[in-house]
């Protein structure tokens, strides 16, 4: 339900699980012990930054599915994006999965915009697992 000019209250939405995969700098920071998976090398054992980003996303998808006890077929929508305005990383990785993909680009706001889109789909009952 919309309240005011730019806010909404959602009543039937919750965050079931998360997965966080990082490189060495995050691993060595104050939150390092809380991440699901970390890499010791900056390129995550890949040959380029882009391939490293792809591996981080693959790992996060697999971990999140596992933590939720879900198969790909259980997911109604996968919503996400990256800092590249062509959504290259997400597009390349999601080709490997049978997940309906909705790419979002908002630069630094991509994560929050993705959550808002997913929550709205759930609230409207367009899906159960987003």
Residue ranges and their predicted role:
Residues 105-130:
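Active-site-proximal alpha-helical scaffold in enzymes
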Residues 1-102:
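Conserved "HGTGT" condensation-loop signature of ketosynthase/thiolase-family condensing enzymes
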């Amino acid at each position: 339900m919309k309240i005011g000019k730019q806010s909404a209250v959602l009543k039937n939405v919750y965050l079931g699980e998360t997965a966080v995969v990082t490189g060495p700098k995050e691993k060595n920071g104050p939150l390092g012990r809380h991440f699901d998976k970390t890499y010791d090398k900056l390129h995550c054992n890949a040959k380029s930054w882009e391939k490293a980003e792809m591996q981080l996303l693959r790992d996060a998808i697999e971990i999140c599915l596992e933590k939720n006890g879900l198969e790909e077929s259980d997911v109604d929508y996968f919503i996400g994006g990256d800092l590249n305005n062509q959504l290259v990383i997400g597009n390349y990785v999601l080709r490997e999965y049978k997940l309906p993909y909705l790419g979002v680009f908002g630069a630094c706001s991509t994560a929050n915009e993705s959550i808002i889109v997913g929550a709205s789909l759930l609230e409207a009952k367009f899906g159960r697992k987003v």
